[in-house]
Swiss-Prot record:
InterPro entries: BetA, FAD/NAD-bd_sf, GMC_OxRdtase, GMC_OxRdtase_N, GMC_OxRtase_C. It comes from Pseudomonas syringae pv. syringae (strain B728a). Its EC number is 1.1.99.1, 1.2.1.8. The gene is betA. Pathway: Amine and polyamine biosynthesis; betaine biosynthesis via choline pathway; betaine aldehyde from choline (cytochrome c reductase route): step 1/1. GO terms for molecular function: betaine-aldehyde dehydrogenase (NAD+) activity; choline dehydrogenase activity; flavin adenine dinucleotide binding. The lineage of its organism: Bacteria, Pseudomonadati, Pseudomonadota, Gammaproteobacteria, Pseudomonadales. FAD binds at residues 8-37. This is Oxygen-dependent choline dehydrogenase.
Amino acid sequence: MTTQSEYDYIIIGAGSAGNTLAARLTEDAGVTVLLLEAGGPDYRLDFRTQMPAALAFPLQGRRYNWAYETEPEPHMNNRRMECGRGKGLGGSSLINGMCYIRGNAMDYDGWAKEPGLEDWSYLDCLPYFRKAETRDIGPNDYHGGEGPVSVTTPKAGNNPLFHAMVEAGVQAGFPRTDDLNGYQQEGFGPMDRTVTPNGRRASTARGYLDEAKKRSTLTIVTHALTDRILFEGKRAVGVAYLVGDSDTRIQARARKEVLLCGGAIASPQILQRSGVGPAEVLNKLDIPVVHDLPGVGQNLQDHLEMYLQYACTQPVSLYPSLKWWNQPAIGAEWMFLGTGIGASNQFEAGGFIRSSEAFEWPNIQYHFLPVAINYNGTKGVQEHGFQAHVGSMRSPSRGRVQVKSKDPREYPSILFNYMASEQDWQEFRDGIRLTREIMQQPALDPYRGREISPGIDVQSDEALDQFVREHAETAYHPSCSCKMGTDEMAVVDGQGRVHGLQSLRVVDASIMPIITTGNLNAPTIMIAEKIADKIRGRQPLPRSTADYFVAGDKPARGKPLREISHQA
């Protein structure tokens, strides 16, 4: 298999965090790294993962998607809901929507109030966001110019619906912001995307591994499914894994550390299979307990969202691009020029608002899309249309991940427990009603047709709740299932080191104590950049001195240009 079976570090999972660690650790001369990935390579000629506008395709099938399903969700009509996770070099950055959103400064300041997490404040994290990024319009106090992640900003001349939707949000009384990752996240504005200057998906495989794999000290094994982490006493000493369809377990040893970067579903699963987790779960499955750690797989969080869809009265939406006869020309322009519809994820505008003054920072996120279709490419509305994705950001609901057997090929039991709190329902009711007010503003008068979904007959609390139960979907942001902290349910410390064990860290979205306000790819890369310096024994980057917006006692909303009354 591999000639050498001992390495300084073994990284499990070549996703957004794992690839970042692999690249940074091998910058140090002589440091050897084994990077294990259960999926395959990120084939550069496969338009499904490389063309931004094709983002729905890799979610279909199982080549690039683990395609997990939840247990029946009790507050969602007992639906088994999708839980897509990336499989292949790049992990979920190979199949995500490419929205580059870092979260709100207050998310990180909130983490830093927890004992042991004092150095996770926004100004401590900002230098690592900048380190990871190359933004196409150049660096500033908030953005980087030399990092491995290519970030593309929306350009003049893009779809007029993006501008109309942002204007409508401002006319509805909400703030405007020119950069959702800059001084002020709160408000409506253009949304950056992780796309290269020539219109390709900027996954972490492209950004970090393309450089790192030139180094002889990095060994990458694809189709390598981790069975378990190997321990001697309380010290992690290696990994046992399977390659392809083989049942032969290959062992590799780590001289320094094992770094678990499987993401919020796989990391707790691998820990539990390795004997690290709630003892009662492990005992039931006859898994020998290495360390009883009750928080492994608990505290699971996600973002739930739904779409409001409208007909478009002018032929400016992307509806024609869904027709097969128009797609060859779109594909050719993208392939040869790196431009056109294919070069964008089409989420070029969005926003963050507070649905009430009860929230210190935004609790609702919008993505605007100039076509009416399901995120996974199904159920396209057969006419010109547009939609707003709306969802709550910091639900109090908590779920869990549990292994069902010792077999590494068996999927775990996943329950998010979506919409378990009254706050969830109130936020979604408010979110839908506020979206309708935004959509009725003058900026959308030239374009707005009838409301396709939910439909104008869906007005009462009960009707809205029923719509959410039946139609809300995951935003694909699972996180927090191996949280950082010092309390009895924390799994790792502020450097990702697993409590009670030696030489083992978890570095991915699972270690977030509380989910961030927005998409999770950029924060996951930042977390890995920050912990990479800890592993390497380097001084942390100097704290930023940039200003950032805190709402304080500012109202969540001003007077709308056009007042809209809600039917009860």
